């Protein structure tokens, strides 16, 4: 069993899915997510409308569409931000402004609500630090993933 398959199996028991999206410059793009949380995130009418406008017509095949966009788009498909739980307004603004004119940057480029964005960036940074420290101490991926 490959390392990725073993990781996917271990995470599956915790309600976490692993999807191989495609090859990128230096390796592979892997999307790790909780299906119920992704469905809730993408359920808003505004998000569904945005994804439809970007060519995501079949809700049950959105990850396959994202995978196809990664293969065929000469530039990175920036709508991936909604799959990563970036604010929809920031994803749209990033596309509209071609990545320029943002008010602050961290995990993503924020175009509105800089205080909220910076708070989220700090939370993500702290979470990453804690999890990396636990991993370095020998905790397995399956132990690090909490059941939802």
Where are the regions a protein language model picked out?
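Short glycine-enriched loop/turn motifs at secondary-structure junctions
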Residues: 23-24, 74-76
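Short capping loops/turns at secondary-structure boundaries
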Residues: 59, 73, 80-88, 110-113, ...
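A glycine-rich, hydrophobic loop/mini-helix early in the fold
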Residues: 1-60
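Generic secondary-structure signature for well-ordered alpha-helical cores
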Residues: 12, 96, 100, 129-133
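Short linear loop/turn motifs
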Residues: 25-26, 64-66, 95-98, 105-112
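Hydrophobic/aromatic-rich, well-ordered segments within soluble, folded domains that form packed cores
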Residues: 77-103
């Amino acid at each position: 069993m490959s390392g990725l398959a073993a990781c996917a199996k271990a995470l599956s028991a915790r309600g976490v899915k692993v999807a191989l999206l495609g090859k990128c410059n230096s390796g592979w793009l892997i999307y790790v997510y909780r299906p119920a949380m992704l469905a809730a995130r993408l359920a808003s009418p505004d998000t569904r409308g945005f994804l439809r406008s970007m060519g995501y017509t079949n809700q049950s095949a959105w990850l396959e569409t994202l995978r196809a966009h990664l293969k065929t788009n000469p530039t990175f498909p920036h709508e991936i931000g909604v799959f990563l739980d970036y604010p929809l307004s920031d994803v749209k603004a990033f596309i509209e402004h071609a990545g320029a004119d943002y008010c602050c940057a961290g995990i993503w480029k924020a175009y509105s609500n800089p205080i909220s964005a910076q708070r989220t960036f700090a939370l993500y940074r702290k979470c990453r630090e804690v999890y990396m420290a636990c991993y370095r101490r020998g905790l397995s991926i399956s132990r690090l993933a909490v059941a939802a």
